[in-house]
Amino acid sequence: MSLSPQGADMSGVLYLGRFTLCLLPVSCFSQKVMTCADTVRGAQEVFMLCIYVELPYYYQLTRIFPADIESLCARMRRFAVHNGAALHEASSVRIFAFEAHSLGSVYAAVRCVRALYQTLDTYEKQVKEFRILMDVVADDASPCLIEDRFHAYRSTLIPDRGFFASFRAKQLLKHYLEFLPLPALNMYQVNGFLSLCAEKPFPQGVTTHCIVVRTTSSYMSALCNFMALHPLSEAVYSTLSEETRAFFFHLRAAVSFFKRRRYDSSFPQYLTDAFLQYVGLYFKLYYEAAPNAAPPPIYVDPCAGHESQKQAEKVLIVSPHSPLMRLPASCADIEAIPQDLAEVMYTLSLASRYIFADEIEEFFLFLKKHADFVGDLFDKMFCTQVTMVPHNAYAIPEDVHDSLEKRVRVKMPVIRECISSFLWKKYQEGSLCASTDLLRTFQELQYKYTSDCVLHSLFHTYSDVQIAHLQVEEYTGTDVGAVLKVYQHTLLVGMREDAEAAFREAKACLTTLQARRFVSAEYRTFSLLGFLTIGQSKFEDALVYFGYALDDAEQLRDGDFLCSALFHLSITYFLQHNFTQARLFLSKLSDAISTYFEQRWKTVSLFMQGRISLSLGEYAQARRCFDEAADFALQYFEHQEPLCRVWAAHARLLADKSYAAHALFQDMCDQYPDAYLFLVESYVRAECFDDPTLFQSFPEETTSREPCVPSFSLDTPIYSGFSCAEDLVWGRQCAFAVSAQHSTVFAHYYHCRVHLHRAEDMQTFHHHKQKLEAIARRAFQIGDPSAALFLYLCYDVSYRVHGAEAAVTTAHLSRAFKVMQRSVAYMSENTVRAQFMQDNFWNAKLFAAAQANKLI
């Protein structure tokens, strides 16, 4: 085919059935804009391809065929939106602008031209005349400047019902449109649309229902893509029982969890188990829906190594009858693919290494290309053998990917920017979890992520204790380093036992963070302020700060932060004895755990539910919660299981008065102080005061105070059930762990009862009585609700020694009942208040004594 030299003054006419497509002389257009376009020549020029559509009798047509013309205009708008074009509308004129930075802009313009051709053919009876002109303008040209450019055609006699293009547009479109020179008319005639490739037969043995394990992905990613490409219909779900359906959708949260953490180098076992359970159930339903379907083959790349082979073999766990095969070799001629189309193909190939199959349409929508554009692209990729499986971006052989990469090397920064910007959007939506692996992915794509993302990752990785000793030299001179330095200083001030100073520093730190809008660091600081106020028994203030932390977690859409904030709110309400609100937030926590699959919070959530039930005298319910927590911990968090067993045994002992738990308590009392506490308490409740040699261990207060910055972290081993609640407040205020304090009180009470009626032991009796009263007095002074129990035990001893009328006896009982009354102040429901005062074992004894002494 002979083409006239570039820059010649030429025009062309294309006869396509009833339409005409002409190439106009370059001289017809405004030289003002042309000068901008002429400054850059060849394939590297910055351009914007535009399509100008005019309906000469638009207003008359809107009166004669209002519905048809409105439908035609709506279609044009849809063409623009679906192909990533900016559409400018002015009376009878429509201008489609395909910006230079938009990937595949020429291919998108050709799709738009084809759609316009077919649509105007459909509306032939209504629209007799129209003019369509294609030209190239400067990429930064304004809509007014573009419209002025196209108005120049009015001085040229152009046939009605015509498609026209400038010489520059022809140079861009020549890979998609066939042009024949007409020397006599000094024009180009376009015969039609070029085919990119000859139709090739479907590769033998290849099926669309296949699992492709790429060299850069895991078997879990391959299974996710297969399930996304072949979703189960609603009809399949309708055959499930309500219980199975609920279980299936519960497990689906594991898939979402995996997708959020897709770049992590390792995954917890509970995720792997739930994921495989979900996939196993999926395949069961998949085969039930298509009983005669063959097991989907598992494909690996022709050049796949040993690791890819191992990943592919793991798929056999859920699909054991699937054959393991290699993808057929590709015969793709990458050089024959138009440059801009190759760029789009490579973009999809590279993006498929970072996103899943059900995110591809979303990705192209982010690039302003709709589903039909993606469908056409997949068709082109398959017919050119870029992909070996129809509509599957994961079946692109590695050598084809590498060839495409060499072809589009110049455009690589733009392509990386498109993918990383989409991933950044996913991160902001909460669909990607902040982690060092995510940061590494952004670095790989050369994306400049924000400082808040780095902080978000650090606060995910490290607890406050770890951050206090974190080496931050690598962040020196950055916003991250400045924030970490301020936050570290706050923590270190707190560790020097100056609570007020730590609070002031935290408030100053918060002001700095809010000014810079570092939401993740703001979340952590609000949590720190909440713990500082909890440590001072300011529960109302703590609820405010934890509430702000919850708002930040919701803004970040971070499941782990959300669960943490909900748990902190629940334990604050628990410490306040507002059990209704505590249960409400534990219920919200349970929902968040299910939604985000943050299973590491499940054990402590169940444990605190058990503690609330225990406080209200619901011993059977408490036992069920502790047993469920222990069973789950045994599977995935073995270090948490013994403590749950200890508390379950305690609840069982309270519920059925069984003493079978004694052996468990004795085995574990050396490692778990709660076991020793419950062992002593069980003897006291059973009135077994016959062995003075028992319980000679009296844990005293620690010699050095704990740091005044209280905190709770799942990363720290938990040896006491009080450490996530009471120890944060009263255990720190008196430097006496709550479990040790309780066991000491019960041990002193036990020995008071043992030596009470032994004249030779009265000195020992008074020693234990004084110790018991000293601990009770201090608990009363600091507002510890346990003072009600301690003072009741003091009352019981005084009653047995001095009688009910003695002043000391009455004083102990009065103070004990006053503490209990103060404890029910936040219980708004009468039933809850009654449960707490009359169903709880020790509270019921105190309540009965108060009634007997006319205090109620």
From Swiss-Prot:
InterPro entries: TPR-like_helical_dom_sf (IPR011990). TPR repeats lie at residues 107-140, 523-556, 603-636. This is TPR repeat-containing protein TP_0123. The keyword Glycosyltransferase does not apply. Keywords: Repeat, TPR repeat. It comes from the Bacteria.
